[in-house]
């Protein structure tokens, strides 16, 4: 019996409906990521790709479990990739061990490796993340518009570097945040001896880059949540305010809100 092949182009390929852990050396560090091939994968048909980033200290296995994407149609149609943060942290946080775009380049390398083995729809590459992973998703949202069609940030840890040196291109953007979040408060603050941004500042960056007219439609959602859809944007911007604490929300159901938003978006 041979050991499982964990290289970036595994042989045999990952079977539809299953997930495997793969590894690559990236810029001198050994990096790891999970790849799940959709239940209905066909080499004839291009598949969207969804990257999912967990919080500080999260293993990709743990995030893949609580993200609950198995409750959505993503499990049927999307190649889902859960990368592991280096020492379980993502760039732009004060505790991160990666800097200067290192994690952005890592994600693009993963995409290239997966694209070499599977039929990827490069027009439908998405990112979602929780907490530190949400902050990193926002980094991708304003630095990797050439790669991603849409991003979704949940309870994001928006440390100041998240909105630094952003590219000006628009991006389909969903932000979900708890108005009672005590860890990453809605109004911003300090943590780990570093400042983090109010949600309105991060939102404002996306409203500016999407040339929105700053007005919005508001509608009530389950669990006392409020959805704000902004008007006049080049690409869609939506904010979901949830009256709970720092979490991956159950009401409204985060995986379905996220996938319903992301899956309809294209890069061009």
Outline where the language-model segments fall.
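A domain-start/cap signature at the N-terminus of enzymes
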Residues: 1-49, 128-152, 158, 201, ...
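Serine-hydrolase catalytic machinery in alpha/beta-hydrolase-like enzymes
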Residues: 20-40, 44-126, 135, 139, ...
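The conserved beta1-alpha1 loop
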Residues: 51-55, 155, 177-178
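Alpha-helical scaffolding within the catalytic cores
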Residues: 63-70, 157-165, 221-229
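Short, conserved loop/helix-junction motifs that constitute active-site signature segments
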Residues: 72-74, 166-169
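C-terminal catalytic histidine-bearing segment of alpha/beta-hydrolase fold enzymes
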Residues: 172-176, 195-197, 207-268
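Acidic catalytic loop of the alpha/beta-hydrolase fold
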Residues: 181-184, 246-248
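Short, flexible/disordered intra-domain loops and linkers
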Residues: 186-197
């Amino acid at each position: 019996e041979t050991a499982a092949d964990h290289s970036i182009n595994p042989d045999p390929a990952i079977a539809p409906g299953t997930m495997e852990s793969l590894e690559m050396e990236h810029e001198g560090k050994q990096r790891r990521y999970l790849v799940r091939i959709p239940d209905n994968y066909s080499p004839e048909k291009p598949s969207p790709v969804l990257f999912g980033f967990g919080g500080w200290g999260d293993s990709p296995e743990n995030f893949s479990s609580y993200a609950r994407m198995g409750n959505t149609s993503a499990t049927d149609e999307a190649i889902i990739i859960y990368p592991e943060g280096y020492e379980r942290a993502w760039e732009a946080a004060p505790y991160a061990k990666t800097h200067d775009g290192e994690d952005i380049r890592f994600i693009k390398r993963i995409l290239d490796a997966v694209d070499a083995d599977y039929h990827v729809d490069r027009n439908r590459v998405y990112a979602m993340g929780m907490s530190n992973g949400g902050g990193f998703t926002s980094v991708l949202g304003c630095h990797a518009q050439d790669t991603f069609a849409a991003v979704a940030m949940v309870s994001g840890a928006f440390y100041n570097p998240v909105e630094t040196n952003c590219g000006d291109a628009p991006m389909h953007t969903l932000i979900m945040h708890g108005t009672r979040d005590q860890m990453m408060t809605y109004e911003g603050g300090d943590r780990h001896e570093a400042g983090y941004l109010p949600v309105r500042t991060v939102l404002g960056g996306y409203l500016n880059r999407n040339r929105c007219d700053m007005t919005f439609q508001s509608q009530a959602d389950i669990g006392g949540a409020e959805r704000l859809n902004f008007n006049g944007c080049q690409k869609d911007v939506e904010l979901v305010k949830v009256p709970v604490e720092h979490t991956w929300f159950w009401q409204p159901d985060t995986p379905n809100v996220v996938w319903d938003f992301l899956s309809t978006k294209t890069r061009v």
